[in-house]
């Protein structure tokens, strides 16, 4: 059974390496930060991803990841160490011996700082293939190098030195480098090491304060709602009390009319009794009594109608009052809803 070979990505081109070094220079405060916490680690990982995006934007056809560009930088730094060592060995062999301590210092100087390389006057760039020498066996993301003509203008030494000088950090340009573009997403990076450690609990305290403030507002709204509900129940209670009073008043009026009716009936019965002794006098009196009774009946009916009219007017007034209260409760309900939506936003 044939073993399938995994297709490996091509080597980094000159343009990709140049872009990689430039982007590392822009983000050196983040990538080479000595602080160790979760926030800094996330920021470093995002910085490498952004560098990979910038390298991919060159358009060489390969899609690099943050891990690949980081590994490419480590290879590049190892290459710089080897070339610096060779250059120092040449100096020693040409009659300029260096003490062992000075040799070690020269090998490590500036390598582990910021970017890890600098534009050294005693270092001679022989070929632009140095951009690709860091590939080889040190990385897993590269394949055989592309064949290029070293005599082409693209690989002129002067142009290469100019490109290198554009990506090598310089003390005069360090203050002009742009800040890490997404640093605001993970708080402001300060030169004081204890600043980020202070910001995290401070941010948590602010979040807790905001949560408590929102909870307090919610409780205030709930208290207002309960107060409105209490007022509504009080109004409903008053309305029922008025209805009970009206019912009792009507019941008393009904009993009074019943008594008046009994009284009139007794008067009629008494007026109809014949009197043999006073037939003439009683005849005249009996003619007047039916008229008086009819007048009383009309008067009582008029009073009853007036009472009924007053009752209807009172009920109308109660109806209008309840309608006004209903509208007030609706307005209060809308106000609480708008206030609640404002807090949620």
From Swiss-Prot:
Residues 4-77 form the Myb-like domain. GO terms for cellular component: nucleus. Keywords: Coiled coil, Isopeptide bond, Phosphoprotein, Ubl conjugation. InterPro entries: MSANTD4, Myb_DNA-bind_5. The modification Phosphoserine is found at residue 106. The keyword Transcription does not apply. PANTHER family: MYB/SANT-LIKE DNA-BINDING DOMAIN-CONTAINING PROTEIN 4, MYB_SANT-LIKE DNA-BINDING DOMAIN-CONTAINING PROTEIN 4. This is Myb/SANT-like DNA-binding domain-containing protein 4. The gene is MSANTD4.
